[in-house]
Each structure stands twice: as C-alpha cells, then as structure tokens.
UniProtKB/Swiss-Prot annotation:
GO terms for cellular component: cytosol. Its EC number is 6.3.5.2. This is GMP synthase [glutamine-hydrolyzing] subunit A. The active site is at C76 (nucleophile), H163, E165. It comes from Methanococcus maripaludis (strain C7 / ATCC BAA-1331). Coiled coil: none annotated. Keywords: ATP-binding, Glutamine amidotransferase, GMP biosynthesis, Ligase, Nucleotide-binding, Purine biosynthesis. Heterodimer composed of a glutamine amidotransferase subunit (A) and a GMP-binding subunit (B). The lineage of its organism: Archaea, Methanobacteriati, Methanobacteriota, Methanomada group, Methanococci. Catalyzes the synthesis of GMP from XMP. GO terms for molecular function: ATP binding; GMP synthase activity.
Amino acid sequence: MIVILNNGGQYVHRIQRSLKYLGVPAKIVPNSTTLEEITVNPEIKGIILSGGPDITKATNCENIALNSEIPVLGICLGHQLISKAYGGHVSRADSEEYASIKIYVKEENDLFKGVPSEFTAWASHMDEVKVTPECFEILAYSDICGVESIKHKEKSLYGVQFHPEVSHTEYGDVLLKNFCKKCGFEFEE
C-alpha cells in the first residue's frame, strides 16, 4: 500500500485514483500523521506527499522526508517540502502560473524510465525550488523552472513540481508506475 499525505491540494484524490488504476492500493491520511504511525504497518511500501496551498501547514512532511526508510515521492508542494527539509531554498516562482508546460528530462533514470526526454505536463508554479540541496540531483527542468524534478543521491526520495496524476500530463502514469516499482510493486509489462 502507498500512503498519501494530504496537504490540502485539489488533486489528492486524483493521486489515489491514479494509483488505483495501476492496481496499487493507496490510502489518504492527514498530513498530521507521523512517520511512526505510517511505518508501524508493514503493508505500507511507500509515501506520497501531495500538493497543497500552504507550505506552513504541511506539518510532518519534512520529518518524513528526512527520516523515512521507505520510498517517498513529493508532488508540487511535497517536492518543495523535500527540498526544504534538506536545506534547499523554496520561494516565489519567476513565472507564476498553472498551465501546460514542456518538461525536459536530463537523462533516463529510475523515475523517468520509459519517458521521452521531452513531454508535456500540467504544472502549478506559485512557489518552486530555487536552490537544490547538495545531496540531490536535478532530474528534469522546464523553460520556466530549473528544478522540475529531483532525486536524493543515496535514498529513494523523489520530487516533481508538476502533476503526474492528471490526464493532461503525458507519461504521468509511467512516472507513478516507476515510483511504485521502487516501492516493490510489480507490474505485468
């Protein structure tokens, strides 16, 4: 099972539905849920930190990003919280918009396996990661944001600024499937 921490974003139920379509059980929990409350259940194989409107109300996300031993994917605000937890800098976007954008993948990696080097995604850019922590590498960027996706260099810890769970994002299902594979789920190819 994948646990989705609800940071109040409009797409949190869409994340759960996208995982269901992949055959992956998922449960939405409040963002006040602690890492200990999550990992006490051995069926939990991964955590997704959802998007949301307010970085100050994402209570346990940074602790989860720092201390989880199971894979974590941050989406939009969740991506920003992961970066912030490790000392990255998050601030207002230069181009504040909610729109379809082109994403450029730097090179194939475990999160973007099977995804072309350029694709269209639906993204929200009010705030964004401006400076990436040293222990992370940038996986993807766009013309309006230099940090569209990150990965911790040693842990299964990922972030994406865009929304892979919405149908407007090309290959979003592939990205979510790749994350689920990191969590130990298997799929018929």
